[in-house]
Design a protein with these regions (language model features):
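Hydrophobic helix-and-loop "lid/oligomerization" segment in the mid-to-C-terminal part
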Residues: 1, 48-190
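Short hydrophobic alpha-helical runs that function as membrane-insertion/retention elements
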Residues: 2-6
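Short, ordered loop/turn segments at secondary-structure junctions
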Residues: 8-11, 23-26, 184-185
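Short alpha-helices
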Residues: 14-65, 72-74
Length: 190
């Protein structure tokens, strides 16, 4: 199987792949701080031969969830993606954002992204293929509702585990201004 790697993270050594799409590897690409989601969008647009508002919206979400700087290309992409989200009302996003919410960088960063990212934070609780299926354009509504509810449940679990560990750290620490804690038993996703 030929593999194309699309990413924005720094590596000491890149994986063996048919192709690697990475802005930081290109001396000619003018803006290096775009995320893998934008790169994936650009590849998809090229393969489709057109721009797609839904995929554009997903690229905007990945820009926020990856905490990329909102300058230059990122700023214009997120702004346009928010416009599309507010106009189009995509089912998958509506189910995650919460009732009576408008799309903005805050709702993307605090309502939508944590629910999506929870699948990666607690991978032993989920089948990641469900999230891929969830974001298909023609997803079944019943399936989308089920997965969005599960995403909310997993995110609540992640929040509870995080709060529990934070409380444990505070209880077991000295009252210093600087606090560092390491515990091999703490789940890596929190």
């Amino acid at each position: 199987i030929d593999v194309i790697v699309i990413d924005h993270h720094d590596y000491d050594e890149f994986p063996d792949a048919c192709a690697i799409i990475h802005t930081k590897m290109s001396p000619d690409y003018p803006f290096k701080e775009i995320c893998g989601g934008i790169l994936a969008y650009k590849l998809a647009s090229s393969l489709l031969g057109k721009h797609d508002k839904y995929l554009f919206s997903l690229a905007a979400i990945t820009t926020i969830s990856d905490m990329m700087p909102l300058v230059d290309e990122n700023k214009s992409l997120v702004s346009r993606g928010l416009q599309f989200m507010n106009e189009e009302k995509y089912l998958q996003l509506e189910l995650l954002i919460g009732e009576n919410q408008k799309y903005n960088t805050t709702t993307l960063g605090f309502n939508i992204a944590p629910k999506i990212n929870s699948f990666g934070r607690l991978p032993e609780l989920v089948n990641p293929n469900h999230l891929v299926h969830y974001f298909l354009k023609d997803v079944d509504q019943k399936f989308a509702i089920q997965i969005s509810q599960y995403a909310k449940k997993i995110n609540s679990k992640r929040q509870s585990l995080t709060n529990e560990q934070y409380k444990n750290i505070l209880e077991n620490s000295q009252k210093d201004e600087f606090l560092y804690s390491y515990d091999q038993e703490v789940h890596e996703g929190i």
